[in-house]
């Protein structure tokens, strides 16, 4: 999620097909795979399976199909199960690389599930599922190395760092390729003989880990590096042609209904907008968040469906803002990227705007979320149109706001 490519998630399965075109042999599920709900994920997998393209193995070992079957599958659960069968989703797979037999398994983390409110699937405990899968691999496969693809992530607080907990509790894992928390690890995290690696977010880096086998059969690191993906890297013509083909479908299958094209220029910008990092990490007014909140109010009052009810307040949470704007031309693609998450009740990509009536007391509670909670959960920083408040950061949490007023 985060670019126009997601708008053809169901109809083209562009992301997973591109992974296959790039030679990726295996991947796992992330929380954003569920953003288009069960039907969307199922349709994407069916599209990929029926495309005829080479696609990566999809690995996840901790889906609790037994519990769902005992309770009776919901329509969405059944759709995903059927699509998993068609695609060939597995707990693990064996890959031969030269004279090395590699076992690859995938796991879906606890926080990933907490970040997927539309996910209908049930999962078993990630650590216990990985333990069970590793035991099965060791019993049935002649694996030289065991690699876990984990959408669980790491944290500065080691006691809450899911992939570090996994490494400690399943010491037979040789490598954990860690995702979900967007962490850029300059050096692997090492627990025992297990290496945890992560190359950050959004394809900014290509991670490379070179290992050599030790006398005891485990593996030691020879080299680890993160290569920045920058514009000076020579273009691969075949890859670019594949990308262009998918992007053309974005115009025809999605943007055409709104009368736009991807590269259409909407505005020329001479403003230095704040970075996403600042938007999340610095608790203050930010022009990017304020602009988007203002845009929400403008969109409502200029809609053909506007009924004349005044818009007093509009709120843009930082967690829904996915990109900033640079100076120069701002295109349709740039605007979509900046708040690209979600899907409406009509099935069209992009969160719809919703209207609600709040009392003064409730507006104070909204302000308290920003004042008290957003330092603990930075995706909850709130950028507002029409609402202003003062707060004292030294007061007790959830009792910091002293004044709230409408502008």
Range-by-range predicted roles:
Residues 1-231, 295:
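Acidic, metal/ion-coordinating pockets
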Residues 2-8, 15, 19-22, 210-407:
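Solvent-exposed loop/linker segments at secondary-structure transitions
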């Amino acid at each position: 999620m985060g670019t126009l490519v997601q708008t053809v998630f169901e109809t083209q399965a562009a992301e997973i097909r591109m992974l296959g075109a790039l030679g990726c042999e295996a991947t796992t599920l992330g929380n954003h795979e569920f953003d288009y709900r069960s039907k969307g994920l199922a349709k994407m997998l069916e599209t990929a399976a029926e495309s005829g393209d080479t696609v990566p193995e999809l690995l996840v070992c901790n889906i609790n199909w037994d519990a769902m079957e005992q309770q009776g599958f919901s329509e969405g659960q059944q759709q995903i199960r059927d699509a998993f069968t068609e695609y060939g989703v597995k707990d693990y797979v064996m890959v031969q690389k030269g004279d090395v037999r590699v076992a690859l398994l995938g796991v879906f983390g606890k926080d990933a599930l907490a970040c997927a409110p539309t996910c209908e699937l049930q999962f078993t405990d990630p650590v216990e599922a990985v333990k069970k899968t590793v035991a099965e691999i060791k019993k049935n496969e002649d694996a030289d190395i065991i690699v876990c693809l984990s959408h669980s992530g790491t944290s500065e607080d080691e006691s809450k760092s899911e992939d570090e907990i996994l490494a400690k509790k399943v010491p037979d894992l040789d490598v954990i390729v860690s995702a979900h928390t967007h962490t850029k690890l300059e050096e692997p995290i090492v627990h025992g003989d297990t290496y945890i690696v992560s190359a950050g977010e959004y394809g900014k880096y290509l991670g490379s880990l070179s290992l050599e086998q030790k006398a005891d059969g485990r593996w030691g690191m020879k080299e680890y590096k993160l290569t920045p993906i920058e514009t000076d890297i020579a273009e691969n013509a075949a890859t670019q042609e594949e990308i262009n083909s998918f992007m053309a479908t974005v115009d025809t299958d999605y943007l055409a209904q709104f009368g736009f094209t991807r590269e259409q220029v909407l505005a020329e910008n001479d403003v230095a907008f704040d970075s996403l990092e600042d938007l999340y990490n610095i608790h203050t007014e930010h022009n990017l968040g304020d602009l988007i909140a203002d845009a929400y109010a403008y969109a409502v009052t200029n809609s053909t469906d506007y009924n004349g009810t005044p818009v007093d307040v509009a709120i843009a949470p930082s967690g829904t803002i996915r990109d900033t704007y640079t100076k120069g031309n701002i295109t349709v693609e740039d605007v979509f990227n900046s708040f690209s998450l979600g899907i409406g009740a009509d099935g069209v990509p992009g969160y719809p705007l919703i209207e609600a009536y709040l009392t003064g007391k409730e507006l104070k509670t909204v302000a308290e979320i920003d004042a008290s909670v957003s330092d603990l959960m930075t995706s909850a920083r709130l950028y507002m149109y029409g609402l202003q408040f003062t707060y004292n950061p030294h007061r007790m949490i959830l009792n910091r706001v002293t004044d709230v007023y409408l502008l």
